[in-house]
Amino acid sequence: MKKRILVTCAFPYANGSLHIGHFLEHIQADIWVRYKKMRGHEVWFICADDAHGTPIMLKSQSLKMSPESFISDIYKDHVNDLEKFNINYDNYYSTHSSENSYFLKKIYHILDKKGLIQTRNIFQLFDNTKRVFLPDRFVKGACPICHTKDQYGDHCEVCGSSYSAVELIKPVSMLSGNCPILKKSLHFFFNLPYFESMLRSWVMSGVLQASVVKKLDEWFKLGLREWDISRDSPYFGFNIPGFLDKYFYVWLDAPIGYISTFKNLCTQRNNLNFLDFWKKNSECELYQFIGKDIVYFHSLFWPSILEASNFRKPTKIFVHGHVTINGLKLSKSRGDCILAKNWIKNLDSDSLRYYYASKLSSKIQDIEVNAKHFLYKINSDVVNKIVNLASRVSSFINIYFNNELSSRIDDLALYKRFVTSSSYIEKMLENCEFNSAISMVISLADIANSYVDNKKPWNLTKNIKNSNTLHDICTTVLNLFRILMTWLKPVMPDLAKNSEKFLNIKLEWANICIPLLNHKISIFKALRHRIEDKQIKFLLPNNFE
């Protein structure tokens, strides 16, 4: 049955270029979307730049630019990188938009009218040297929960807890290096504890991975707290209605950007109805891909806002781990990262897509990028086992049979084994168990190569009586290659495109069970090349940008 699906990725922050850690999520979601589209579902894929906050304001000031000009340049940079990695968003937008301003204020008025917003004076961290209230990411100290040092002012990367910056132990301003003072300010709070019963029921409904539910249970036991949705001037963002010096916290307007980005897409597509996807009891499905560091926001704050404002909640949230290199999490704010554009200068997008897919599962585990393992994985799996399968037999079809496949499969049992394996791969891709799907693909590629080794088609060319057998064997191998590449099409779109040109067909999931017979193929050309040692030097320590 055809489903109508909306898929989102968490929004990259618009204060610098994307690194390969960002692309773990974009690639994971893009593979899943491409797979679902190949299965015949209607899928809409959206994302946007998270374009508000003090860090953006300060960065633009340092560059002597307006925040609007700065985020415009960053937007173009992000879009360019995403396109080079074949991330096919139907709409990539920005939270600094008229639609987002509209929905943010509309939702705020609904919350306020329902008595879910309260105001009170609180103490905030203030840098007396720079004369500015410190945003969460511009103050560091020890986590108030687990006491880990060097944590930001909103969230601990070790224990996953969220907290107020004033709770940090021994806070230090990242702007001046001084200890900030406490300064009183009027702030606006959303009544998150009111939704605890709903949230407990919702998180147990299968919308999240088991390990996430376990973590949420810990947070429930600690007790939910009111959520500060306001920030003080100076700030780059949307004003709270009626207050010129108060702004909405970026973590309120950013998730609402999922709604506004889809609304903007609807204005571009006449056949797309906004409420079909976002009304309370929508029959459409909503899948959201996020990193483990923003689970608190997406599994507690976000569904509560949706419930209160009468919008639908996600069908499922896929949570992934971080990307590490040399055991360290890639971090744009810390400057230890490999920029996406640097990857493209040295390598190709398919190679990173495949490498991530070979490691991604439904478990929330960090993925280590190891240069030598990466080189081995691509050369061994993709070049030696998959691409080589086509190159081993294609010349026989090109030279002896006028580029035309035969009328029969030599080993029907082997072909059927590949076809029946599709159900397992479908299940793995559906559940984001990409590593298991890739393992099955490589296992079957090994079997296909063993078939070639056993049949030795090169020996059959010596006697014309073997012509039909040779023809059938090569046809069988290219059909097995076709099935392998159909499975890999969502993972490696460039290789799939080259394979389609060679096979002279469009790789369709529905056609896996139908042998390609009496069919003209093209002259074989190298579908991709091996990766050389010199190409991975930028992945080694001391070469990061």
Curated annotation (Swiss-Prot):
Short sequence motif 'KMSKS' region: positions: 329-333
EC number: 6.1.1.10
Keywords: Aminoacyl-tRNA synthetase, ATP-binding, Cytoplasm, Ligase, Metal-binding, Nucleotide-binding, Protein biosynthesis, Zinc
Pfam families: Anticodon_1, tRNA-synt_1g
Binding residues annotated for Zn(2+), in chain numbering: C143, C146, C156, C159
MF terms (GO), sorted A to Z: ATP binding; metal ion binding; methionine-tRNA ligase activity
Superkingdom field: Bacteria
Cofactor binding mode and count: Binds 1 zinc ion per subunit.
Catalytic activity: tRNA(Met) + L-methionine + ATP = L-methionyl-tRNA(Met) + AMP + diphosphate
Cofactor: Zn(2+)
Any one Gene Ontology cellular component term annotated for this protein: cytosol
Functional summary from the UniProt entry: Is required not only for elongation of protein synthesis but also for the initiation of all mRNA translation through initiator tRNA(fMet) aminoacylation.
Protein's recorded name: Methionine--tRNA ligase
Gene of this entry: metG
